[in-house]
Amino acid sequence: MDSSAVITQISKEEARGPLRGKGDQKSAASQKPRSRGILHSLFCCVCRDDGEALPAHSGAPLLVEENGAIPKQTPVQYLLPEAKAQDSDKICVVIDLDETLVHSSFKPVNNADFIIPVEIDGVVHQVYVLKRPHVDEFLQRMGELFECVLFTASLAKYADPVADLLDKWGAFRARLFRESCVFHRGNYVKDLSRLGRDLRRVLILDNSPASYVFHPDNAVPVASWFDNMSDTELHDLLPFFEQLSRVDDVYSVLRQPRPGS
């Protein structure tokens, strides 16, 4: 595979600029030097340089004919299995990885929390991973409050071992990777309707608005994180998630103006 497509993330410049998805084609073509190719390949969740649409997924939503009847077809297969008994009454929270919980780089970092070996085209590369401040307490508490699902546009060969080391408490009931995204207008989008959960009881935490463009009313936005060890975003979000964990319908809260918005 092209070594420029394994990790999906955005740069600091892109985070400060107009809202774009991670790996947006225009920014990738005009701003990213070739040295970032491997990084873009591993983490990049949003764009495919060839512009090729993803193949149809078995979890695609049912099509509805003009008269409202559902055409006969194979029963839909959702991305998630049925919720476990302990999670049956909990809201499902989809949580992003790169620039939300961690930041990764192929450039050596002295204070890396994890070093992940990733094979690309027969060559093993070391990926240096920094944990966002307060991520441990955040995941521990989120796992108690919600049915948590890791959903990243990065490839599993990178994201799976990162999640193994990051999630000490088994907060993530499931992990979804790039192949579970929908390719839409140059971005990898996380289509929440394919999860198999009531959308009134689904949240998504992601630093990229392009990732939840299909369901913006389900989103709890989070600022992109790179290396600021004084960051308190995850800690500051916990009281809001505590509130959301007690509602019957997330729209009753998320469709209301939030302080500072």
From Swiss-Prot:
Q: Which Pfam families match?
A: NIF (PF03031)
Catalytic machinery residues:
96, 98
**Site described as Transition state stabilizer, positions?**
152, 190
The biological process GO terms on file are: negative regulation of G1/S transition of mitotic cell cycle; negative regulation of neurogenesis; negative regulation of neuron differentiation; protein dephosphorylation; regulation of transcription by RNA polymerase II
Keywords of the record, alphabetical order, are: Acetylation, Hydrolase, Magnesium, Metal-binding, Nucleus, Protein phosphatase
Notes on how activity is controlled: Stimulated by GTF2F1. Inhibited by beryllofluoride anions.
Q: Which GO molecular function annotation, any one, does this entry have?
A: metal ion binding
Top-level EC class, please? hydrolase
Q: Which SMART domains match?
A: CPDc
Q: What's the catalysed reaction?
A: O-phospho-L-seryl-[protein] + H2O = L-seryl-[protein] + phosphate; O-phospho-L-threonyl-[protein] + H2O = L-threonyl-[protein] + phosphate
Complex formation: Monomer. Interacts with GTF2F1. Interacts with REST.
- NCBIfam families attached to this UniProt entry: HIF-SF_euk
Record's function text: Preferentially catalyzes the dephosphorylation of 'Ser-5' within the tandem 7 residue repeats in the C-terminal domain (CTD) of the largest RNA polymerase II subunit POLR2A. Negatively regulates RNA polymerase II transcription, possibly by controlling the transition from initiation/capping to processive transcript elongation. Recruited by REST to neuronal genes that contain RE-1 elements, leading to neuronal gene silencing in non-neuronal cells.
This protein is called Carboxy-terminal domain RNA polymerase II polypeptide A small phosphatase 1
